Amino acid sequence: METPALVATVFVSCLVLSITGYSLYIGFGPPSKELRDPFDEHED
């Protein structure tokens, strides 16, 4: 198997999974309490 291609594939896969996990943590985890909702701020 091509070692550089395998290393690059594993690196990119880990990068994508870590970014996805971090964004889910920010969106739904404890830090989500600090996010503001622009729709709640705009009252008609």
UniProtKB/Swiss-Prot annotation:
Task: From the record, give the cysteines joined by S-S bonds.
Answer: none
Q: Which Pfam families match?
A: PsbN
- Where does this protein reside within or beyond the cell? Plastid, Chloroplast thylakoid membrane
Name where it mostly resides: plastid
Query: Where on the tree of life does the source sit, at the highest rank?
Result: Eukaryota
Membrane topology term reads:
Single-pass membrane protein
Q: Which UniProt keywords apply?
A: Chloroplast, Membrane, Plastid, Thylakoid, Transmembrane, Transmembrane helix
GO BP term, pick one: photosynthesis
Q: Which residues cross the membrane?
A: 7-29
User: Quick one: a GO cellular component term?
Assistant: chloroplast thylakoid membrane
The record's section on PANTHER family has: PROTEIN PSBN
Its biological purpose is as follows: May play a role in photosystem I and II biogenesis.
- Report the family membership: Belongs to the PsbN family.
Name by which UniProt lists this protein: Protein PsbN
What species does this protein belong to? Answer: Nephroselmis olivacea (Green alga)
Gene, per the UniProt record? psbN
